[in-house]
Amino acid sequence: MKIRIRILPLIFGLLGVLTAAAAVTAALRSLNAPPYLLEAPESASDCADNLMQCICQGDYLQAEQYLQGTPDLELNRSPEDPVGVLLWDAYTSSSSYTLIGGLYATETGLAQDVRFEALDLDAVMKSMDTLAKELFTAGIESAEDTSAVYDKEGNYREDFIQDTLLSAARQALADNSQMTETELTLQLTHQDGHWLVTADQALFRIICGGITG
């Protein structure tokens, strides 16, 4: 019994030290963590969520209402040619996003971290460029009648060009299914009673399909 009396204080003392050490460690770690809000404004969270939904749906006209000081990007314009429609549909249909953590305070307002995933359209475009040149040459060489390739002025027929590009786009999409992941931070500011996202290069990049040129 005497042994237990001596050991118990030691055990409780050790537990106290460990608890204190854990508290200090947690406090130190929290210094480097973003100041997450216990009760974030629902309208700010909705703004970030709705913007990303619009981007994933390819509804850029609707997305504009959640952006602050949007430059003239003509986001409401959709591709009109078959190749553009095919590529853009493939990109938007593959798009998805995840809100990482919650809103946290910044010097200018609030911020929300986001993980965005979509088809690597940049890789598809580069593959399409190579394929188009190969198919273009093959189409000319295999044509039984030059009128299928050239018009009366000796220029390449527009339908021949478009058919070649469309074939190249389809093959490039079939050969390239790689996804690309982007992590970005949406910066939100309160303006005229509404929360708006300040667009930056990372956001513009996913809006433009991640194409680098």
Q: Where on the chain are the PLM-derived regions?
A:
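Core segments of small alpha/beta cavity-forming domains
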Residues: 30-106, 123-125
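Short Pro/Gly-enriched beta-strand edge/turn motifs at strand-loop
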Residues: 81-85, 164-171
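Residue-level signal for tight coil/turn positions that link beta-strands
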Residues: 105-109, 192
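Short, cysteine-centered beta-strand-loop-beta hairpins and adjacent loop/turn segments enriched
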Residues: 117-135, 176, 208
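Short beta-strand edge/turn micro-motifs at domain boundaries
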Residues: 134-156, 172-213
